[in-house]
Design a protein with these regions (language model features):
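Phosphate-binding loop that captures ATP/GTP phosphates
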Residues: 55-112
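Short, hinge-like loop/turn segments at secondary-structure boundaries
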Residues: 5-9, 77-82, 186-187, 214-217
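Flexible beta-alpha connector loops of hexameric P-loop NTPases
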Residues: 84-92, 119-125, 173-175
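A short, flexible beta-alpha/helix-coil linker loop
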Residues: 35, 69, 117-120
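Soluble periplasmic/extracytoplasmic beta-strand elements of cell-envelope proteins
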Residues: 31, 112-114, 197
């Protein structure tokens, strides 16, 4: 929750700055990514969404982009009623009405677009559809939060093009630090234009690499 609060604060600052600039229109898009599983990525994404909607009274949608094994719907206690799979045939004709019809409302005020219920259904979701969803959602909400899978898919690359704010999650172990370093290099190679917040989850544990050492190794400040 502490990590989500920090990212929420950053997102709010981005929103305030965007409101002052004529060049930016629509929602602030925040993508949460971890280069390996088990980093608490989905917990941070769901907490961030509920903080922004419940405490900060923002209009928020949460997109579960972990198409093969996403758990956002389950973690938030929502019924498996609808998902992104219901939009697979609406790529070019997708509009706000169609998108709203498949979103699941949470008690915090967040609207969730769930991942498919079965892994094999992920193949039906094209990257262009995800880009279209983010584009439409950006006109409906103040914040679009995207819970990315722990690997760089074409869908992830598609949303990076429209991401304002990337929460990059690392845990205090050598494997995670190595993979995070690679992720930072890839972002540079892709000329990623958004801001990158490095989040060390479980940084308060007595075992593992310290936050200071991680920041120095990655040459990047920790949020």
């Amino acid at each position: 929750v502490a990590a989500a609060n920090r990212v929420a604060g950053e997102a709010a600052l981005h929103a305030a700055a965007a409101n002052q600039g004529a060049a930016h229109s629509g929602a602030i898009v925040t993508s949460i990514y971890a280069p390996k599983g088990g980093c608490g990525k989905t917990s941070i994404a769901t907490n961030l969404a509920t903080i922004l909607s419940g405490e900060m009274k923002q209009r928020v949608c949460l997109l579960d982009l972990d198409l093969e094994s996403g758990d956002v719907q389950l973690i938030m206690g929502l019924p498996p009623a609808r998902s992104v799979l219901d939009l697979q045939n609406l790529t070019d004709s997708l509009d706000a009405t169609a998108l709203a019809s498949v979103m699941l409302p949470h008690s915090s005020g967040t609207y969730v677009l769930a991942a498919p219920q079965r892994p094999e259904q992920a193949a039906a979701i094209r990257p262009h559809l995800i880009s279209r969803i983010v584009n439409v959602a950006s006109k409906m909400f103040d914040h679009v939060i995207i819970d990315c899978p722990p690997y760089a898919t074409e869908h992830v690359l598609a949303v990076l093009d429209v991401t304002d704010h990337l929460g990059l999650i690392c845990t205090p172990d050598a494997a995670s630090v190595k993979n995070t370093a690679i992720s930072l290099e890839v972002l540079t190679e892709l000329n990623f234009n958004g801001s990158v917040d490095l989040i060390v989850n479980r940084a308060g544990e007595r075992v593992g690499i310290s936050g200071t050492d991680i920041s120095e190794a990655l040459d990047h400040p920790i949020t």
